[in-house]
Amino acid sequence: MNNLPLSNLVILELGSSLSGSYAGQLMAKFGAKVFINEPLPSGNPLRFLVPSDYQIKWWNTISKNKFSIAIDPSSLQSTLSVSDILSHVDVIITDIGPSQWEINPWLKHYPSCVKKPLVIDIYPSGTDMSHLWQGSSLAEFTAANSGMMHLTGWEDGPPVGVEAPIAEYLAGMMAASGALAELGFSRKSLTSPRPISMAMHEAVLRMIEWQLPIASLEGQPVLRNGNNFPMNAGISNMPLTKDGKYIAVSAASQEVAMRLLHLIGGPELANHPDYATPKARADNMKDLYLKLNTWVSSKTLEEVLRIAQEADIVVGPIYNALDILHEPMVIERNNLASMNLSGHEDTFQTVRIPKVSGIRQVDVCNAPDLGAHTLDFLQLISQKTLN
């Protein structure tokens, strides 16, 4: 028996955004049947978001455990209409913005659906309010126009982009969470699910929501602060060890900061007026980091970790992707699964996270070939129309 919590959901992806793709992938990992509708002849633009040497690996990362269909809504036969399809899927994921629904070849049929699906619309900020929005409406600028990028980097340097699709993943995760909440409510109340509409910057605002009231009270924005959390006087740096390994050091509380200062400079450093209090450390952080970096650079990673553990200091190695693949704890937790890339080399992919007790892991399947499941999808919809 299939006990995956979303195995009863049929999801139709109509967009080409990373945020929508992530939302679909999250639900696919819990058993949902996710069908990506791809345009012929080239397929979804997401396939080509990276250089050609990495496209197979990339597509298998973002579209594993999904199905591909290639349906032109204008060429459907009379036996099956767009309304039939929309009425017999549970969720639609798109990225066009609500103002475009009435002219979209798929969603213009939404009002005539006998049974309305839940529509998740995650669109680039400004798409629906171009008269108010400054700059580009491309999704790539979400980190910039949400305030997140302004907080990343050194205090005396330019903003720095985070080289991970944080904005897209946040939007996808929040949309998927909201969708499941709305589906649960609509099924309990026997009503049609209400559409979920979200401009991408709205997801990232949740990450900086505490800084907005502070800015409104002080009349100026919170500034980026290097490796320190903005407005934080804790010690937080990433020094280099003697054997060329970077580590992360964190001493946020006064108690831990004192232990760290005693460790690297003894009572003289810990009691020095420049470092003895949070305010003093905040005013002299650059000098303190020079002392910390010098101490760390005189020892190997193994030595630093051992000494820090003995002194009850928060220190850990900074892993790269290869380190994670060989980390015993990751292996023991079964966080990764092997996948053969359609006759190419084997690779590893993350499995469903979080894990739910008593539910088996979904087998990791290759991302679909273009249009490989069109007939299966049409047969599925046809069967649903007969029931």
Which ranges hold each PLM region?
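Aromatic-enriched alpha-helical interface/lid elements that frame and gate functional surfaces
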Residues: 230, 235-311, 315
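Substrate-binding/catalytic subdomain of NAD(P)-dependent oxidoreductase enzymes
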Residues: 182-224
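Glycine-rich beta-alpha junction loops
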Residues: 41, 124-126, 200-205, 243, ...
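Terminal low-complexity tails and localization/encapsulation signals of metabolic enzymes
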Residues: 1-9, 240-242, 322-387
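Active-site Gly/Thr loop motif
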Residues: 218, 222-236
